[in-house]
Amino acid sequence: MHTENARDTLKQMSKVTGKACVCFNLRKASRLLTQVYDQALKPTGIKVTQFSLMMAVAGNSGTTMGKLARPLGMDRTTLSRNAKILENKGLIEIGEGDDRREQILNLTEKGVLVLEEVIPIWEGVQKKLAEKMGDQRLKELMSDLRDLVRESKH
C-alpha cells in the first residue's frame, strides 16, 4: 500500500517538476534547439555544438584548452574529446603549449572556410527564431540566460 501511495505522489510531482524545474526545461529547450540548428547545418557536415566550439576557437586563437573550457561551461575532458573530433576533420589544430601538458587550439584554413559556409546558415536560424519569438523577447531571454549562468557560478 505504501508503494502505491508513493507512485501516486511521484506521478503528481513529475507534473510539477516538468513545469517548474529550471534545469529540466532548459535541457528540453536545448535538445529541441540543437535539433533545429543541426538540421539546418546538416549540409555542411557540422553540428551546432561543433560550430560553437569552432567560434570559440576563432575568437580565442592560440588559447589553451583549459582557458577555453571555463567560458564554454565545459570540463577539459569534454572539451578535449570535442576538439579531437574537429581536429580529425581538419578544422582545428591542437598544438603543444609552453608546458607539454598545455594544448593550444587554432582554426585551420579548412576550418575558416567551413565557418564562412556555416555562419550564414546559423544567421538564418537565428533570424527565424527572432521572428517567431520577437526581437524583444529574444533579447530578454538572452539576458535572463546570462544572468542564470552568472548566478549559477556562485
Model-based region annotation:
Residues 34, 84-143:
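Charged, amphipathic alpha-helical coiled-coil/dimerization segments
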Residues 1-44:
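N-terminal leader segment of winged-helix/HTH proteins
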Residues 60-64:
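Short capping segments at the starts of secondary-structure elements
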Residues 49-51, 77:
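Key DNA-contact positions within bacterial/archaeal DNA-binding proteins
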Residues 32, 36, 52-55, 113:
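Pre-recognition alpha-helix immediately N-terminal to the DNA-recognition helix
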Residues 1-15, 136-154:
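C-terminal regulatory/oligomerization modules of transcriptional regulators
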Residues 27, 55-59, 119:
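Short, locally clustered residues in the helix-turn-helix/winged-helix DNA-binding domain
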Residues 65-66, 77, 84, 103:
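Residues within helix-turn-helix
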